[in-house]
């Protein structure tokens, strides 16, 4: 009842099967308009974009673990029962437009499903009740009013969460830890993150990693951010020392660009900036 009162568009689909093949006409026909029409052997889905609803889809263990550190609290949480109904978070986006559709972010460190987080709005849907084709069920953890946010704010939070999740995954398998955190600090500065954003990422990762002293790691971060540019060591060192693939490097950079807004620049802009920086270092500009 609360969901319908908040103008969240819910439609039913075949039980035990994702409604991805349903046409928009079918979804409109199957819209749920009153709670009395809810049936037990049906799946139920939220049509994102409708009513300015967007969702954060937490596809990896690390993004689910860290979500509360980065995403605004909201009254709308749902997902698989095995994830406690918290793997999807819904928000009302105040400035949502038709061009705000879907952004999916991966970390390709394995041959399986590598998507770690998604931001979805127009032209997409998300299952919120019923049974998946693998037998798991979808449940609500909260079914109240979604909190309000702007698209840019939510997208940045998605980027921050994705970077922190990737960093946490790698921190757990990268020794020595002190060097990993030092070079990661360099990577964040290298990609123009503010100290405040870098500090928030470090804080969350350190708290969940649990194998190092916060004071030591934060001192490293501050030292790197206070250092001259010529003294920096960042992502290239991480890639080399811990054998990251080019795919892993590209995925991580994509998330870093979301935080600073560089993801919205034309595709050639980042290469142009790199060329200018190189020329400046060579004193040719």
Language-model features and meaning:
Residues 215-249:
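Long, compositionally biased
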């Amino acid at each position: 009842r609360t969901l319908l009162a908040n103008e969240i568009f819910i439609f039913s689909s075949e039980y035990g099967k994702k409604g991805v093949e349903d046409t928009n006409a079918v979804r409109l026909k199957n819209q749920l308009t009153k709670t009395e029409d809810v049936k037990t052997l049906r799946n139920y889905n939220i049509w994102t974009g409708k009513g300015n609803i967007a969702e954060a889809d937490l596809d990896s263990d690390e993004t689910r673990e860290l979500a509360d550190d980065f995403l605004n609290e909201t009254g709308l949480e749902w997902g698989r029962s095995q994830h406690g109904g918290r793997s999807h978070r819904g928000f009302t986006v105040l400035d949502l437009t038709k061009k705000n559709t879907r952004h999916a972010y991966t970390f390709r460190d394995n041959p399986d499903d590598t998507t770690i987080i998604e931001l979805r709005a127009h032209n997409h849907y998300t299952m919120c009740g019923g049974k998946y084709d693998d037998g798991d069920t979808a449940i609500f953890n909260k079914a109240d009013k979604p909190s309000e946010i702007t698209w840019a704010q939510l997208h940045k939070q998605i980027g921050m969460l994705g970077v922190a999740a990737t960093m946490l995954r790698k921190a757990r398998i990268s020794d020595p830890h002190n060097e990993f955190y030092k070079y990661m600090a360099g990577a964040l500065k290298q990609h123009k993150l503010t100290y405040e954003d870098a500090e928030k990422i470090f804080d969350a990762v350190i708290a969940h990693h649990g194998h190092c002293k916060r004071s030591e790691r934060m001192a490293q971060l501050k030292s790197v951010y206070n250092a001259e540019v010529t003294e920096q060591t960042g992502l290239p060192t991480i890639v080399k020392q811990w054998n990251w693939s080019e795919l892993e490097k590209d995925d991580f950079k994509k998330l870093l660009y979301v935080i600073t807004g560089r993801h919205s620049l034309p595709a050639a802009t980042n290469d142009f900036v790199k060329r200018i920086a190189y020329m400046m270092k060579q004193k040719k500009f």
